[in-house]
Structure formats: structure tokens, C-alpha cells
From Swiss-Prot:
It is a multi-pass membrane protein. It comes from the Eukaryota. One of its GO terms (cellular component) is chloroplast thylakoid membrane. Its EC number is 7.1.1.-. Belongs to the complex I subunit 5 family. InterPro entries: NADH_UbQ_OxRdtase_chlpt_su5_C (IPR002128), NADHpl_OxRdtase_5_subgr (IPR018393), ND/Mrp_TM (IPR001750), NU5C-like (IPR003945), Proton_antipo_N (IPR001516). The keyword Thylakoid applies. This is NAD(P)H-quinone oxidoreductase subunit 5, chloroplastic. It comes from Chloranthus spicatus. GO terms for molecular function: NADH dehydrogenase (ubiquinone) activity; quinone binding. The chain crosses the membrane at residues 9-29, 40-60, 89-109, 144-164, 184-204, 219-239, 258-278, 280-300, 327-347, 354-374, 396-416, 425-445, 542-562, 597-617, 719-739.
Length: 739
């Protein structure tokens, strides 16, 4: 067994030969490498599969024996300073390794078809393999120095992946935004690491945890400084895992190819921040203020991410905000000390979210031949609808992923989210109420996404649709429905009343004037004929196979953490994890009984079903029937109440669609402020600093010229100066005598 652990150091480096081979091939024999580009997918999947098998073997041994293995190499720089490099194999490492490799494999298989047409296919594979290497190196690190090295490599890979389509301006801006935002967290992490080393004199985890704990308990270090160092470490995790207030890069990162979105949101970049907090939790637990801060940031992110997802039209942005919210649950669990529940939800969410992202990729892939290859159209849920009869396999897998994220039993996320909700009651009823309420919001926006995409009719075939990007010719109601909107250009819509406002339940269709239609026809595509032969098609088998694999994970991975609800011992996760860090369940024999489990589950599931019901009433196939029968209007009479309700809906929509105005605040308070400061500094530098130096030079020039002119050897110049000084002296004498 120990023989197996001795070779665990190879785990991060197994996928690396693919990146190196592709790079050397493109450098030395570019033509042959590009001609055989599809061949590189096989070694990418093969090497990552070897890593997965090795990681699984280590995990099985840990489950059976609860072993923790660490190996260190000491590098002595001088007598007073030495660095230790090595690897650490503990339950957290094995969990993250399996998560990274399994999700990475299905994403690579999926990408072989999805990215086959892209000219950057080889670059895509090299980036993906190097990203897996960086993430595996991060989770196997045994000290803070290695953590920081691989942390920066993960950030670099994320920058390269987000900017994969760098020729598109929005993608280039997105990768820069992600890079700058994460540099804030990286700087905080570096300062925190240096501060901890100054306190403890060690970078290695075990020594650092023990020394730090003893210093805190014995008052051997200033408590404020120790809290500051721990806070700086947490800032790095906040930025990397897109937690409030450094979450603004996440929705813009959806400019990447969809397989990259699945990898980033499930197993790599956003999971790195959660891993860091879990790894350093022994430091955070001895400082209660930090634990409270972690829980507070988590619960704010939970609610913020859910509210921002309510009115999104882009299917990938909706999933991005969902990731932000679900990682908030994980951060909340870590903040309240529920270590097991946090890692459990990290596992279940990773597979469910990978399924949803790859499912959205299949949807986008089916829509692109119809609406074009612009993300503004192919990812717009308003142009979808009715896809269930065209892509039934994708529909089924996406529905299962949706139910899982909504917390519907017996799917994966139900078990982990329910455990977090229960533990939150023990920590803070206020946090618990927010977490439970957000569970209902999650069910609402996830089922809204499903209904807009798969139910009803294919919206793109509606009469009067055109593919113009400008929203002035068509508009979307606040909840994603198509509706009228006043046109502010010099077109005349014959039946539109510009004073009429968009109604929440309105389905009225306005006819476009013939002149306008003729003008539009010259630069847009029309789908007036509902019987057109162009319809979405189901994806190829190489894209459907990963979806089916992830469905199996979504169905059964939750069973590894079922605790106390059956007579059989299925709780593999508790055997896997070292439970001593869990502050809430210190009694290892504690587990909820059947009655307690069902009471808690019924409450949380009822909230989820309520959110699904609201979404179904607003977007389901019976929506038009409810409207025609005025069942909804029975509850909302015309008058002040309806006006108030419309205002509330508009406030919610504006908050969600404008990203909570946080980006606007950053653009106003930070971006413009920094630019103004830069302009002021530039002005001061040009006018003051350069003015002084240039003034000295100019003055020296004129003085020199004057001296040169006076001392040129001319008698006339000497006489002139002599008379000039005589006149000055006489003038001064006269002036002095008068005084």
C-alpha cells in the first residue's frame, strides 16, 4: 500500500506530455501536427484516465484504512532557511483528484466533437491538459509555496481558456476582467502566506497548523494581525470561487467554448477557492471572526447569485449565476464548520453542473445552424422553446440535472443541500431562512430555464421574428417572454401604441408595417413560415455519451453521503473524510433518524416544489390557458395593487438584468476613479515634474547663451554692460539718498 502512495507524485504530471507534445509539434512540424490534430484527443483522454484510475486506487485505500500520506524533499538554501517540497495525499486530495479527472475525461470526450470544426482545436487540447495538470498539482501540494505556484498556474490557464476566442472583443475583455479581478485575490493570498510564515516560520501545512493554533491559544501572536493574515488568505478564495464581492468576472467568462465552461465551473477554477478554504480550515477555525466572515460571504453569495439569475436570457449566464449561488452554499457550510456537507455539495454540484453545461452546449450546437453562430442568438433562451421534440435525449438529461440542482430527491444535490440547510439552523436561524428561501429561488430560475428552452413552441419560427441583434425591433418581457417594445428609430409600426407598456402576462403580437419589413429583409433573416425545413437536430453520439455518463453520476453519487436514514451503512463519505474538523458533529456516532430526516427533507423539498410551481405557472404550457380563464387575474385586480405588483416585478427585473448594479458601481467608483486619478497623475507628471526639469534645462540654456554672448570678446558688449551697471548703481544711490 505504501508503495502505491510513494508514486502519487506523478498524478499532476501524467496529463502534461500532451501539452508539451502539441507545443513541440506546432513548433517543429506544424503542418503534420495540424493534419493529425484529431489524433491528439486519444492521448489526452488516455493519460487523464490513467490519473483517474490511480486516484481511485488511492481513495479506496483511504476509505478502507483512513491513511494520510505525506512525502517531503528538503531544499536547504542556507543554515537559517530551507524549503520543503512534496505532496500530500489525504481525503481532500483524493476527492478533488477524482472530481478533476472524471469531469475532465467526459469534457474531453465531449469536446472532440464540439470543437472539431475549430481551427484552435490543438490549442484547446493543450490548454485543457495543462489546466488539469495545474489543478492536480494544486490539490496535491503539501505547503503554501506549492499552493501559490499552482494557484498562479490555474489562474493563467483560466486566462488562456476564457480568452480562447481572443479575436472576439467580448472574449478578450472577459479574460482581462477575470485576470484583473483574480489578481486582487492573488495579491491577498500572497500577503497572507507571507504573514503566516512571519508568524509561524513554516510553509508546511501540518507544522503551520500546529504552531498557529498554539500561538493563538497562548496569546503568542497579536490576534488582530493573525486575523488579518487569515482574512487575506480568504480573499484569494473569494476571487477564485466568484464569491461576493469579487464575483463580477464569472458571467463574462461565459464567452468561452461551452466545454471550457463545464470544466471551469465544475472541477477547476471555481473549485480551487473552495479547496483552499477547506485545506486551510484548521487555521480559520481557531479564529471565530474568520469563520463568521466565511459564513456571511457564503450566505450573501447564495442569495445574490440566485436573484441575479432570475431574469437572464443567456442560458450559460444563467448557469454561471447558478454556480455562484451553489458555491455560496458550499462556502456557507465551511463557514459554519460543516466540513463534510461542504465537500459533499462540492461533489454533487460538480457533476450536476457539468451535466447542465454540456447539455446547454448540445442545445447551442442544435440552434447554431438555424440562428447563426453568434452567441447572442444561439445562447438566447428567448429564441428557443419546444426543443423537447427535436433533441429528446438532451432534454431528458438536462431535466435530470435541473431537478438535481433544485434539490429534488433522490438526485445528487438533494442529499448535500439538505444537509447544509439542516446544519445552518444550528448556526443561525437568519442564515437558515436565507438559505431555504434561496432553495426556492433556485428551483424557480432553473425550471424557468428548462421551460423557456424545451417547452412550448420553437420561438424562432414565430411570425415577425428577425435575426437582427439590435433589440429595437423585438423585445423580451422581464421574465423572458417575447413582447412589444417601442421602437426608437425611424420605423413606423402600424399597430403599435408607443404609450402602451409591456405587460407581464401580455401575449399580444404587433404587426410590422410592410415598408419596415421590406427594409428589414435586406439585412436580416426571416422565419415567417412555420413549416420551414430547418429544425434543431440532436447532437452526435460522442456528445451524448458524456451526458449519459454524467446522468449516472447525478443519479447515484449522492448515495455516498447518505447517513443515518437506512439500516445499511452507505455513508462512504464519512469513512472517507476525517471528521475531526467538523465542528457541528463532534460525536461520530451522531446521525439523524428517519423521522428527523423526513421532517427536514419535506420542508426543503416543499420549498423547491413551490418554486417549480411558480415557474410552471408563468412559463409552462398551461400558461395561456390560465391567462384565458383569468385565473391569475383573480388574484391581482386592476388598480393600485396591480400597479404595485408591476413595480415590484420591474424592480426585480432591473436588479437581475443589471447584475445588481454591482458592475455599474465598480465602473463608476473604481474604474472611472482610477482613470481620473491616472489622468491627474499624468497631468502632474507632465506639468509639474517634467515642467521643473524642463524649466531648469531651458533656464540653463538661456543663461549659457547669455554668458556666451557677453563673453564673446566684443568691446561693444563690454561697454554696454559697463554703462548698464553704472546706471543701476547711480539709480540705487539716488534712491537711497531720497530715503
Amino acid at each position: 500500500m505504501e508503495h502505491t502512495f510513494q508514486y502519487a507524485w506523478v498524478i499532476p504530471f501524467v496529463p502534461l506530455p500532451v501539452t508539451m507534445s502539441i507545443g513541440l509539434g506546432l513548433l517543429l512540424v506544424p503542418t503534420a501536427t495540424k493534419n493529425l490534430r484529431r489524433m491528439w484527443a486519444f492521448p489526452s483522454v488516455l493519460l487523464l484516465s490513467i490519473t483517474m484510475v490511480f486516484s481511485s486506487n488511492l481513495s479506496i485505500q483511504q476509505i478502507n484504512g483512513s491513511f494520510i500520506y505525506q512525502y517531503l524533499w528538503s531544499w536547504t538554501i542556507n543554515n537559517d532557511f530551507s524549503l520543503e517540497f512534496g505532496y500530500l495525499i489525504d481525503p481532500l486530495t483524493s476527492i478533488m483528484s477524482i472530481l478533476i479527472t472524471t469531469v475532465g475525461i467526459v469534457v474531453l470526450i465531449y469536446s472532440d466533437n464540439y470543437m472539431s470544426h475549430d481551427q484552435g482545436y490543438l490549442r484547446f487540447l493543450s490548454y485543457m491538459s495543462f489546466s488539469n495538470t495545474s489543478m492536480l498539482g494544486l490539490v496535491t501540494s503539501s505547503n503554501l509555496i506549492q499552493i501559490h505556484i499552482f494557484w498562479e498556474l490555474v489562474g493563467m490557464c483560466s486566462y488562456l481558456l476564457i480568452g480562447f476566442w481572443s479575436t472576439r472583443t467580448v472574449a478578450a475583455n472577459a479574460c482581462q476582467k477575470a485576470f484583473v479581478t483574480n489578481r486582487i485575490g492573488d495579491f491577498g493570498l500572497l500577503l497572507g502566506i507571507l504573514g503566516l510564515y512571519w508568524i509561524t516560520g513554516s510553509f508546511e501545512f501540518r507544522d503551520l497548523f500546529e504552531i498557529f493554533k498554539n500561538l493563538i491559544h497562548s496569546n503568542g501572536v497579536h490576534f488582530v494581525f493573525a486575523t488579518l493574515c487569515a482574512s487575506l488568505l480568504f480573499v484569494g478564495a473569494v476571487a477564485k470561487s466568484a464569491q461576493f464581492p469579487l464575483h463580477v468576472w464569472l458571467p463574462d467568462a461565459m464567452e468561452v467554448p461551452t466545454p471550457i465552461s463545464a470544466l471551469i465551473h465544475a472541477a477547476t477554477m471555481v473549485a480551487a477557492g473552495i479547496f483552499l478554504v477547506a485545506r486551510l480550515l484548521p487555521i480559520f477555525t481557531v479564529i471565530p471572526y474568520i469563520m463568521n466572515l466565511i459564513a456571511l460571504i457564503g450566505v450573501i453569495t447564495v442569495l445574490l447569485g440566485a436573484t441575479l439569475a432570475l431574469a437572464q436570457r443567456d442560458i450559460k449566464r444563467s448557469l454561471a449565476y447558478s454556480t455562484m449561488s451553489q458555491l455560496g452554499y458550499t462556502m456557507l457550510a465551511l463557514g459554519i464548520g460543516s466540513y463534510r456537507a461542504a465537500l459533499f455539495h462540492l461533489i454533487t454540484h460538480a457533476y450536476s453542473k457539468a451535466l447542465l453545461f454540456l447539455g446547454s452546449g448540445s442545445i447551442i450546437h442544435s440552434m447554431e445552424p438555424i440562428v447563426g453562430y453568434s452567441p447572442d442568438k444561439s445562447q438566447n433562451m428567448v429564441l428557443m422553446g419546444g426543443l423537447r421534440k427535436y433533441i429528446p435525449i438532451t432534454k431528458t438529461t438536462f431535466l435530470l440535472g435541473t431537478f438535481s440542482l433544485c434539490g429534488i430527491p433522490p438526485l445528487a444535490c438533494f442529499w448535500s443541500k439538505d444537509e447544509i440547510l439542516n446544519d445552518s439552523w444550528l448556526y443561525s436561524p437568519i442564515f437558515a431562512i436565507i438559505a431555504y428561501s434561496t432553495a426556492g429561488l433556485t428551483a424557480f430560475y432553473m425550471f424557468r430555464m428548462y421551460l423557456l428552452t424545451f417547452e412550448g413552441h420553437l420561438h424562432i419560427h414565430f411570425q415577425n421574428y428577425n435575426s437582427i441583434k439590435n433589440g429595437s425591433l423585438y423585445s423580451i418581457s422581464i421574465w423572458g417572454k417575447e413582447g412589444p417594445k417601442p421602437v426608437k428609430i425611424n420605423f413606423v409600426l402600424s399597430t403599435m401604441n408607443n404609450n402602451e407598456k409591456v405587460s407581464f402576462f401580455s401575449k399580444k403580437t404587433y404587426q410590422i408595417d410592410g415598408n419596415v419589413r421590406n427594409l428589414m429583409r435586406s439585412f436580416s433573416i426571416h422565419f415567417y413560415n412555420k413549416e420551414t425545413s430547418v429544425y434543431p437536430q440532436e447532437s452526435d453520439n460522442t456528445m451524448l455519451f458524456p451526458l449519459l455518463v454524467l446522468v449516472l453520476f447525478t443519479l447515484f453519487v449522492g448515495s455516498i453521503g447518505i447517513s443515518g436514514v437506512t439500516d445499511m451503512d452507505f455513508d462512504i463519505l464519512s469513512k472517507w473524510l476525517t471528521p475531526s474538523i467538523n465542528l457541528l458533529h463532534k460525536n461520530l456516532s451522531y446521525s439523524p433518524d428517519w423521522y428527523e430526516f423526513f421532517i427536514n427533507a419535506i420542508f426543503s423539498v416543499s420549498i423547491s416544489y413551490f418554486g417549480i410551481l411558480i415557474a410552471f405557472l408563468l412559463y409552462g404550457s398551461v400558461y395561456s390557458s390560465f391567462q384565458n380563464l383569468d385565473l391569475i387575474n383573480l388574484f391581482v385586480k386592476t388598480g393600485s395593487k396591480k400597479i404595485l405588483l408591476d413595480r415590484i416585478k420591474n424592480v426585480i427585473y432591473n436588479w437581475s438584468y443589471n447584475r445588481g448594479y454591482i458592475d455599474v458601481f465598480y465602473a463608476t467608483a473604481l474604474t472611472r476613479g482610477i482613470r481620473g486619478l491616472a489622468q491627474l497623475t499624468h497631468f502632474f507628471d507632465r506639468r509639474a515634474i517634467d515642467g521643473i526639469t524642463n524649466g531648469v534645462g531651458v533656464a540653463s540654456f538661456f543663461v549659457g547663451e547669455g554668458i556666451k554672448y557677453v563673453g564673446g570678446g566684443r568691446i561693444s558688449s563690454y561697454l554696454f554692460l559697463y554703462l548698464f551697471y553704472i546706471i543701476i548703481i547711480i539709480f540705487l544711490l539716488i534712491f537711497w539718498s531720497l530715503i
